[in-house]
Amino acid sequence: MISTVQDSLEGHFHVLTPIKLNLALHIVGQRTDGYHLLESLVYFSLSGDCLSYAPCERDRFILTGPFAKGLSCNSINLAVRARDFMHKTFPRSAKPSSFQLMKTLPVASGIGGGSGDAASILNILRQKWKLDCSCEELAEMSLALGADVPMCLFALEYQQPLFVKGIGNDVTRLEEACSIAMVLVNHGQKIATETIFNALEKRNHPPLKINPVALKTVSSLVEVLQETRNDLFIPALKIAPQLAEVLSTLDESGSLFSRMSGSGATCFGIFKDQQAAQKAAAFIKSMHPNWFVKSIITLGRSSQ
């Protein structure tokens, strides 16, 4: 399933790509090839970048939007690599495509923007080319594009939060997890994921223990999160001390629980409902007009 925003013309449509949020992230080891082993509670919102697709005679990729500056339309861009990956993997089914990506999410911000874009392109082409390939099969193959791409594919397919282990390839769907209202805040400093992982002083932290039953309501979820961590926060804070101000601002705006997502620098706050989240987002934006602030609703069951 894809989050379809518009289907105005045959074959032409727009989707909003997934935002990935690590509500908890425990680093529990490291493989000999350098990949870190993690355990993470991951939620998603289909309110990210805007991706437009249309069939065409020759491949085309266009970048626009407030966060497109400095990005390229070549193989350095993960979204372009995803398109090229599909051409190489399914040459007999491949057809030219035109993609326009409006970047509305900060780059290098710990919310999987690039991975969500890539997963959306994989998912679109799987459907448009009518491939005899399941989401699970494509997710396994797409690990070559990055550890976050498979989980974003699963988010598009199943519309549920996930418990993720290993290097991102061991995924469990959390079917009972409720949808939550959140506010995302980014103060503007880019943080390279590799830099944060290299700065880790310890790579064998205690595992993440989550009882799926506790994810059914916002209040019980918040209680569970109090006993979890983001093991990347301490090294990120040393690089970007402004993170402390962001988290403090979220708390002041009424957040029930605030934390940095992934390797940063985006932080999130959990709120009791959408109205509270929207009110908090407006408050934070008025106080810090240069910050990225976004109110979202995550995928999941209704908690009502």
Curated annotation (Swiss-Prot):
Enzyme type, top EC level: transferase
GO molecular function: 4-(cytidine 5'-diphospho)-2-C-methyl-D-erythritol kinase activity; ATP binding
GO BP of this protein: isopentenyl diphosphate biosynthetic process, methylerythritol 4-phosphate pathway; terpenoid biosynthetic process
Binding site residues for ATP: P106, V107, A108, S109, G110, I111, G112, G113, G114, S115, G116
SUPFAM superfamilies cross-referenced by the UniProt entry: GHMP Kinase, C-terminal domain, Ribosomal protein S5 domain 2-like
Domain of life: Bacteria
E.C. no: 2.7.1.148
Gene3D superfamilies reported for this sequence: 3.30.230.10, GHMP kinase, C-terminal domain
Pathway, per record: Isoprenoid biosynthesis; isopentenyl diphosphate biosynthesis via DXP pathway; isopentenyl diphosphate from 1-deoxy-D-xylulose 5-phosphate: step 3/6
Family: Belongs to the GHMP kinase family. IspE subfamily.
Protein name, per record: 4-diphosphocytidyl-2-C-methyl-D-erythritol kinase
Species annotation: Bartonella bacilliformis (strain ATCC 35685 / KC583 / Herrer 020/F12,63)
Lineage: Bacteria, Pseudomonadati, Pseudomonadota, Alphaproteobacteria, Hyphomicrobiales
Gene: ispE
